[in-house]
Amino acid sequence: MPKRDDIQTILVIGSGPIIIGQAAEFDYAGTQACLALKEEGYRVILVNSNPATIMTDKEIADKVYIEPLTHDFIARIIRKEQPDALLPTLGGQTGLNMAIQLHDSGVLEANNVKLLGTELKSIQQAEDRELFRSLMNDLNVPVPESDIVNTVEQAFAFKDEVGYPLIVRPAFTMGGTGGGICYNDEELKEVVSNGLHYSPATQCLIEKSIAGYKEIEYEVMRDKNDNAIVVCNMENIDPVGIHTGDSIVVAPSQTLSDVEYQMLRDVSLKVIRALGIEGGCNVQLALDPHSFNYYIIEVNPRVSRSSALASKATGYPIAKLAAKIAVGLTLDEMLNPVTGTSYAAFEPTLDYVISKIPRFPFDKFEKGERELGTQMKATGEVMAIGRTYEESLLKAIRSLEYGVHHLGLPNGESFDLDYIKERISHQDDERLFFIGEAIRRGTTLEEIHNMTQIDYFFLNKFQNIINIEHELKNHPGDLDYLKYAKDYGFSDRVIAHRFGMTESEVYQLRQDNNIKPVYKMVDTCAAEFESTTPYYYGTYETENESIVTDKEKILVLGSGPIRIGQGVEFDYATVHAVWAIQNAGYEAIIVNNNPETVSTDFSISDKLYFEPLTEEDVMNIINLEQPKGVVVQFGGQTAINLADKLAKHGVKILGTTLENLNRAEDRKEFEALLHTIDVPQPKGKTATSPKEALENAREIGYPVVVRPSYVLGGRAMEIVNSDAELENYMEQAVKASPEHPVLVDRYLTGKEIEVDAISDGETVIIPGIMEHIERAGVHSGDSIAVYPPQTLSQEDIDTLEDYTIKLAKGLNIVGLINIQFVIAHDGVYVLEVNPRASRTVPFLSKITDIQMAQLAMQAIMGTRLKDLGYKQGVQPYSEGVFVKAPVFSFNKLKNVDVTLGPEMKSTGEVMGKDLTLEKALYKGLTGSGVEVKDHGTVLMTVSDKDKDEIVKIAHRLNEVGYKILATQGTAEKLKEDNIPVEVVGKIGGDDDLLTRIQNGEVQIVINTMTKGKEVERDGFQIRRTTVENGVPCLTSLDTANALTNVIESMTFSMRTM
């Protein structure tokens, strides 16, 4: 069938900022879709609020709007651009919900905009729990016993009928937001209240729990001619009860008989046909392990996290083909881009095993509730490919970057068996490693199965891994056992530990005896057809399918799984670096392990190696490919941390030299450099023991900032005010980075400034200076950044320019450098220097039209910036004001304090741009999920040190018509200044302030931290209640001040004559 010719312009809605449940997979999907539509000759308009994406580059669509993803802003774009059609199924749940709102409000009809792909009726049938249940009943497809509720009372009525446990699934949400498993009345009340709050339809499905069933997923495609295929089927190792995004997943399924596989395949195709899906779709099913009974859990009528995984697992580009199906093309007329000869209607076949393991943020949030359920908690994921299940699992484990390298915890021997079993009986992120530990101690597989309901197939595989460990220990240095262990995915590091050797000795033993991996191609067809996909994985077999060319090569290290502190920004930089390498005529090779990203799309680089980012795995590739050099500065701390290890093997690190990378990180060397170039920093010292840290802090004077060196995202960084706090910190921090010392610095309050620069060794260009709204002490990734700076004098800017050039030249930077400064009462100080790409690179690149990562890569390859027409120093400002606002996922993580400080907590970001600061801030705040209202009620409860400052904010909010509530101490201060205020009772009192928040009486909460970070403190409860009820909680008065400016700009002041 020919593609549609009744439409010319298509609007694509992106998924917005990275949050738990909606990560980089939608940048990958959206980028693919936009390029596919342009390929077919359509004009593409893209709207997305996330600047850290490849999708929002000007080259990806004909017009790109970086605006808040709200009904009003998208309606304006529709009225302005007059698109013929809207494609809603590639922007995650956000895009889907937006399309429904635009349809329901009449905007689409009023502007003659058609919906492409799956019809709205079908989307609503899949998303609306009641309609879906009704359709399944018509099809005779079993669904768990359930009820649809709109109130807590209805939920209790259903509970009385069927009893506990119950699963709560809110409608029209993603990542299981607001849902959970309930075992008692208290949990049911809390979860249903939350679920109704987060569901746009105020609707929850409550179903009898089928926890313990196998969870199976089918990723399916269908076109308008009713051609339908299964792209990939996947099995969750964890049974039903844990969100699939938090489950360890294997593809293809390993424990289904052919009868079971075909039965569930038939059901999946029957359901998508009944729904009328056109494009990609994910079907989740539950299968009784002891019979052929099954239930359908849910259907996602859109491209999802699972479809990104299925695309990377098979090589089959789901989002690209879904976009083409949406404009009328059919599966039997589109060629499979992987083979170039077979058609897209052929179902992919796998001759390898895929393992996906989620990456959780609990290294950041040690007090966060680790228990896993139906609400997703992982920030990202890793994928690994192997010829055996054991191989793919062990490769995935060592990709996680938790400091865990194998099926067990580093300190596993120290736990007693009772504790290990206790941990296994709870579903949390470390259960897999405790299972390994239990098997090592002789616990039977039957006992583990009874505790976890994990299939014996997988438990036997874990047992096999432990058996191989024993054999290695019993046969140290034996080449047959070495080769056998490599076949099953063991790393040199683990083998060395069992052999009683060093890792480098095992590496040498392998080299001397030619025990090396070969690289196999991912080709969608198990080598049935000729294929030229440059997409490879390593395994210990005989035939190598990765043909090495004569071309000069540059290898780029990716940034691994998405986590707090290292997000999609680094993937953006990686992709741009690859494009620059290709433009310069080199062969570009990527090594990465994240299935969600654009960089692991095989069409981006000349060769993609989907492998763990470890010394061993990367060196194996380097030994084969012999690149000219390796680029580490675009892959975040993951890649930087490998530089030293690779250099010891004689690998050339391109760009800033290893010596200079280390000078920026080594405290003493960096201080010596600052002294030489005359750039001041806050007084600080290095400590290698708690005793030394205390001596340093007393000498410098409290408050001090303490942090380990060589970390990203402010990991384990804290401001401490006393000996007692410091002693408590040292117990934690030395754990965070044992091989590196702790830095103790004077804490300076003042404006924080961030600068990104590019240097070729001679010329230093500064694309932009960003001013943070929150003063120093809040991590730069959690601050609102403003470009151009709004309150700096020309003298400040000249000083920042001078210091940046001195630092870049002093460190002999070739490529990118990111510097954070503080402007205190007595001048400008340098806080931190990162000799690599930073998370502000995409933001500044979008604003200034300077492709920073590409320019840096050109400098790394020897191009002079002067020859490209750039002059040294700060580049001319772009027109307008641009704001980068952080986005948090606190509503997904229980027991995590929302207070901002030097350790990063945000998962994503949005951009707001306009002609004035207030308008840009309004867009930034709105895009980040803060509903800015011109009237309402604000609750204030601040620490003593902030009481003078809160008076000014309260006065201004009162002037524009806000009602003010405050706790006793804060209220007394406001009353002294004649500000009308209502006193609210303390927690647990008669007029409990938590009740006021829960009842929806409060629109903003301003709460600053009182001493002591313990979960039990009232402040923590206030902040958590605020987040859980979807109310903006501001923990910095600078943010509160900025919000007040925005509210004032929206309203008129009311004063008597």
UniProtKB/Swiss-Prot annotation:
Domain MGS-like: 930-1057
Pathway(s) served: Amino-acid biosynthesis; L-arginine biosynthesis; carbamoyl phosphate from bicarbonate: step 1/1; Pyrimidine metabolism; UMP biosynthesis via de novo pathway; (S)-dihydroorotate from bicarbonate: step 1/3
Listed Pfam families: CPSase_L_D2, CPSase_L_D3, MGS
Region (Allosteric domain) residue spans: 930-1057
Residues engaged in binding Mn(2+) 1: 284, 298
Binding site for Mn(2+) 2: 298, 300
Reaction equations catalysed: hydrogencarbonate + L-glutamine + 2 ATP + H2O = carbamoyl phosphate + L-glutamate + 2 ADP + phosphate + 2 H(+)
Span list, region Oligomerization domain: 402-546
The record's free-text note on cofactor binding: Binds 4 Mg(2+) or Mn(2+) ions per subunit.
Keywords: Amino-acid biosynthesis, Arginine biosynthesis, ATP-binding, Ligase, Magnesium, Manganese, Metal-binding, Nucleotide-binding, Pyrimidine biosynthesis, Repeat
Record: residues binding Mg(2+) 2: 298, 300
EC number: 6.3.4.16, 6.3.5.5
Matches recorded under PROSITE patterns: ATP_GRASP, CPSASE_1, CPSASE_2, MGS
Cofactor(s) essential for the protein: Mg(2+); Mn(2+)
Residue ranges occupied by any ATP-grasp domain in the UniProt entry: 133-327, 671-861
InterPro entries in alphabetical order: ATP-grasp (IPR011761), ATP_grasp_subdomain_1 (IPR013815), CarbamoylP_synth_lsu (IPR006275), CarbamoylP_synth_lsu_oligo (IPR005480), CarbamoylP_synth_lsu_oligo_sf (IPR036897), CbamoylP_synth_lsu-like_ATP-bd (IPR005479), CbamoylP_synth_lsu_CPSase_dom (IPR005483), MGS-like_dom (IPR011607)
Ligand binding (ATP 1): 129, 169, 175-176, 208, 210, 215, 241-243, 284, 298
Binding site for Mg(2+) 3: 820, 832
Subunit structure: Composed of two chains; the small (or glutamine) chain promotes the hydrolysis of glutamine to ammonia, which is used by the large (or ammonia) chain to synthesize carbamoyl phosphate. Tetramer of heterodimers (alpha,beta)4.
HAMAP family reported in the protein's UniProt record: CPSase_L_chain_A (MF_01210_A), CPSase_L_chain_B (MF_01210_B)
Family: Belongs to the CarB family.
PANTHER family linked: CARBAMOYL-PHOSPHATE SYNTHASE [AMMONIA], MITOCHONDRIAL, CARBAMOYLTRANSFERASE FAMILY MEMBER
Protein's name according to its UniProt entry: Carbamoyl phosphate synthase large chain
Record organism: Staphylococcus haemolyticus (strain JCSC1435)
Gene name of this polypeptide: carB
